[in-house]
């Protein structure tokens, strides 16, 4: 048997909570309250330097090799495909830089305490990091915990049954939509080849919160009027060159503000008999899309 992988739009990523998930806040937990995260901001993830340091510390190739093999490759974008939309502006993520991550945190005033964990103004960088129960995801969590330890970040790992995490029960505190932790991890993608609807997921109106019964698609509660303007412009732009430019700008804005931290571009895997030739995987269609070209060797 031969194995092949085709890479579409699936990206395993870390979602960064821009709002405060402290349980003591009650109904205001992980709620966006006016302005750009200035009234219920996350106590440390609202600091750009912390978000950037978390990304810099991750060796994504280790995650690929340990959990995905040929079915994964490093992604520095939330939109890695189709290729015409893929930005090259964020490729620094392919090479971890622990020294720079530590320098950033030092310069921003996040100093290591006696336990080695960084803190500032009494706030410790202690992350609760959740995902669904899955052996590959738990391995990824364990690797990232050790990587973040190198920069003075404490990490508590949590995994939940996929039926709960992805379930959407508005009475449950454990769904990915409610996002009552600091960091969460999962894969998302879109069908088809036009990214307009997908990229609109991170507009301000899409924030998942109590008022819309956590039905929005903007889990980080990241809000940028500039991003909203790009999304609105894309909705009325028909020229392909303009749509490509706008899509890349939107992707880069998300990536360079670390609204989320992409990890792995996940492929669709299939196998076929060694006696067949002409088999080509296509992430946009059925595995049988070119069956008319198949022949026996």
Region spans (language model):
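A glycine-rich phosphate-binding loop feature that marks nucleotide/adenosyl-phosphate handling sites
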Residues: 122-124, 267-271
């Amino acid at each position: 048997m031969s194995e092949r992988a085709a890479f579409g739009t699936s990206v395993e990523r870390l979602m960064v909570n821009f709002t405060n998930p402290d349980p003591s806040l009650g109904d205001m937990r992980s709620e966006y309250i006016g302005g750009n995260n200035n009234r219920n901001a996350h106590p440390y993830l609202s600091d750009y330097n912390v978000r950037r340091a978390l990304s810099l510390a991750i060796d994504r190739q280790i995650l690929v090799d340990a959990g995905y093999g040929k079915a994964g490759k490093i992604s520095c974008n939330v939109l890695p495909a189709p290729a015409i939309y893929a930005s090259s502006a964020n490729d620094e993520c392919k090479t971890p830089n622990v020294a720079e991550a530590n320098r950033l945190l030092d310069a921003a005033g996040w100093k290591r305490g006696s336990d080695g964990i960084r803190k500032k103004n009494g706030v410790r960088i202690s992350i609760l990091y959740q995902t669904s129960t899955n052996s590959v995801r738990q391995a990824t969590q364990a690797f990232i915990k050790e990587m973040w330890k190198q920069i003075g970040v404490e990490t508590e790992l949590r995994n939940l049954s996929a039926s709960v995490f992805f379930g959407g029960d508005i009475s449950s505190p454990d769904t990915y939509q409610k996002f009552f932790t600091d960091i969460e991890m999962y894969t998302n993608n879109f069908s088809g080849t036009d990214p307009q609807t997908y990229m609109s997921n991170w507009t301000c109106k899409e924030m998942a919160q109590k008022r819309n019964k956590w039905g929005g698609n903007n889990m980080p509660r990241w809000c940028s009027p500039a991003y909203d303007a790009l999304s609105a412009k894309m909705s009325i732009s028909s020229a392909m060159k303009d749509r490509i430019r706008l899509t890349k700008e939107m992707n880069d804005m998300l990536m360079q503000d670390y609204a989320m931290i992409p990890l792995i571009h996940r492929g669709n895997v299939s196998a076929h008999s060694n006696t067949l030739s002409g088999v080509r995987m296509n992430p946009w269609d059925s595995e049988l899309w070119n069956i008319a070209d198949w022949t026996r060797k």
